[in-house]
Amino acid sequence: MASYFDEHNCEPTVPEEQYRQNALLELARSLLSGMDIDLGAVDFTEWDQRLPPPASKKVVESLPKVTVTPEQADAALKCPVCLLEFEEGETVRQLPCEHLFHSACILPWLGKTNSCPLCRHELPTDSPDYEEFKQEKARRQQKEHRLECLHGAMYT
């Protein structure tokens, strides 16, 4: 006896593709049933596959310029990108995470990506799609945390 796939001359669906198809079907059903859409069924992992966009030009321009103090110079602090020691009185850029960099080192970096090269602290971008993705990701993490807390509270 021939299998279902042999009889219908087709191939079984890959699990990742099946998930996408189910999400699209759920979206279509929601649209047809009065726009009652549950965004939990929509997969927002598209940005996980791509590089993040550059940091916002406005944010980069507003990064504070800090003068290296004698204490910092004596501590032999180095720029994490070029590994040259900061000199006393030198003007460097400070990211919101408080890491210091030479302007010539950090500005090209932030022109390509939106995060600190050391700790990956993310700066805002000019991409509305990416900002929406970050908000949705934060909402999902918050929801998962609340569910874990609820689950933990049920069994303590």
From Swiss-Prot:
Pathway(s): Protein modification; protein ubiquitination
Instruction: Name the UniProt key words of this record, in alphabetical order.
Output: Metal-binding, Transferase, Ubl conjugation pathway, Zinc, Zinc-finger
Q: What is its EC number?
A: 2.3.2.27
Q: Which reaction does it catalyse?
A: S-ubiquitinyl-[E2 ubiquitin-conjugating enzyme]-L-cysteine + [acceptor protein]-L-lysine = [E2 ubiquitin-conjugating enzyme]-L-cysteine + N(6)-ubiquitinyl-[acceptor protein]-L-lysine
SMART domains per record: RING (SM00184)
List the CDD domains hit by this protein, alphabetically: RING-H2_RNF181
Q: Give me any GO biological process, just one.
A: protein ubiquitination
**GO annotations of cellular component type:** cytoplasm
Zn finger region (RING-type)? 79-120
List the Gene Ontology MF annotations in alphabetical order: ubiquitin protein ligase activity; zinc ion binding
What biological function has been recorded for the protein in this entry?
E3 ubiquitin-protein ligase which accepts ubiquitin from an E2 ubiquitin-conjugating enzyme in the form of a thioester and then directly transfers the ubiquitin to targeted substrates. Catalyzes monoubiquitination of 26S proteasome subunit PSMC2/RPT1.
Write out the similarity annotation: Belongs to the RNF181 family.
Record protein name field = E3 ubiquitin-protein ligase RNF181
Q: What is the lineage of its organism?
A: Eukaryota, Metazoa, Chordata, Craniata, Vertebrata
